[in-house]
Amino acid sequence: MKQDTLEGKAKTKNGVKRLCFSIVCILLEVVFIITIVTRLNEYAEIINLFTRILSGILVLGLYASDKTSSMKMPWVILILVFPIMGVGLYLLIGLNGGTHKMRERYAKIDSKLLPMLSDNQECLNRINETIPKAGNIASYIQRNSQYPIYQNTDIVYFDEAVKGLEAQLKDLEKAQKFIFMEYHAIEDAEAWHKIQDVLEERVKAGVEVRVFYDDMGSIGFINTDFVKKMETIGIHCRVFNPFMPGLNLFLNNRDHRKITVIDGKVGFTGGYNLANEYFNYTHPYGQWKDTGIRLEGDAVQSLTVTFLEMWNAVSAKDANDPDFSKYLFHYDYAAQQTGFVQPYADSPMDNEQVGEEVYISMINKAEKYCWFMTPYLIITDEMTHALCLAAKRGVDVRIITPGIPDKKFIYNVTRSFYHGLVKHGVRVYEWTPGFCHAKMSVADDCMATCGTINLDYRSLYHHFENGCFMADCQAVVEIKNDLIRTMGECRDVTDQYQTGRSAYLRLGQLFMRLFAGLL
C-alpha cells in the first residue's frame, strides 16, 4: 500500500445512529433553553441580575482555584462575554471531575486499593542513588499517586501496535486465572475478533475475563448490544460513563486508559486501542504509528490496581464491598533485566496533574536532550515555558507530531503552538507517512515514558490516563532509537515556523489558542 493511501473510516450503523440521536437531542435541549430564555423577556432584568451574580461567583471561584492560567482564562472570557452560554457550558463540562459523589466513590476505592501496593522503599532508594534525576521523578510519582517504583520486571517495547497485538494474543492464550482489559476504544471488527476468539476459549477453560471500555471512545465502533453479546459468551463487560443527552457533570471526563493484565503476571499498555486503524488493517489517515510495552514481573501489580479502580468505580455496589485480594498477590519471578519501571495512573478526580508533572519534570531534569512524540500539541503556559527554557539551556528539545491529522481543527490548533516553541530553539517534526498516535518521551539515554497521555489539555486535565516511567533499562534505548528512525521519515518544519505570520493567521490562531483548554 502506498503511504499516501487514505481509506474511509468504518463505522457501525447503530453506533453512528446513537451518536447522531444524542447530538440531535443535545441540540434540541439548547434550542429549548434558548426558547425558554426568550419567552422570559418580562423577567429579563431579574434573569440578567441573577446571571451576572452567578457569573461573578464563578469567575471568583476560577480565580481562586488551583487551575493554571491557561485553563482559567478561556472560561473567564466566555463567562463574562457570553454569560448565559458561558455559565451553562462551565457547569456542564468546566467543573472537571464530576460530582462530589463520584469523587467520594473513587477516593473510597483508592483508599482500599493503593495501600495494597508495597512502597518498595529500597528500590526507590536505589534509583535515587544511581540516577538521581530519574529518582526525583520516581519519588514525585510515588508520593503523589502512590504508585511505587519496581525492579524485577522485564520490559518489551513494541515500535508498532500490531507487534503488541500479536504478543497480547500469545499471552492471552496462556491465561489461567483472569484477564482484565480496559480500553478507550474497541471496534467490533477484525482486530477485536482475533482477541474475542481467544477470550471465548479462555472462558471455556474457566478463566475470569473482564472487558471495560469508554462509551464515547467506542460509540462509532460498536453497536448497543455489544455488552449483551459479551455477557452471552461469558465475558464480564462494563461501559464507562455512557454518553447520553442531558445534564451530566461527568460527561467531559473520559477513560483514556489502555491496559491488559493477564493473571497478574503479564501486562500491556501503550497508545493503541483495539480498533483496526491502530494496527494498519485500515488506513483512514495514511499509515498509523503507535507503540506499546509488555511488562512481566512485579510492576504488573500496579496495572492490576489501575484496572480494578475503574472497574469498581462504575458500580456503587462494588465500590462499597470490593474483594481485591485474589487479584493482588506476590509470585516468584526472576527478571532478566535490572532496570527500573513505574506504571502510574492519572485521574481528574483529584487536583494533581501527574501526567503533566512527569513530562515537565523530565524536561527540567534533562541535560542533553528531551524528545516527545504526540498526536496533539495543545499545552499549558507552564509546559510551554519548560520546553522553551530547556532549549535555551542548550538541551536538544524535539517534538514529533502527525503529518496527516485525524481532526483538522485540532491539527490547526496544534500547529498554532509551533511558532512560540521554535523561536526559542525547540525543533518540530511532522511524520509524513500518516498519523502518529504514540505518546512517548525520552531524555538523556536514562529515562523514558510510554503510555496514553497526549500533550494536550484533555489528557493532562480531563481524562483518566495511565503511563509507565522507565529508567536505566533497554526500553529507554529502544524508544530513543525508534524516535530517531521516525524522525528520518519526518519533515522538519522548524525553519518554516520561525518566520512571522500574517495578521489574519495570527488572529485565527489566537482565537483557537484562547479556547484550546476546552478542546
Regions found by a protein language model. Name each.
Residues 1-357, 361, 405, 419-424, ...:
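N-terminal localization/anchoring segments of enzymes in phospholipid and broader phosphate metabolism
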Residues 355-372, 392:
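Long hydrophobic segments that form regular secondary structure
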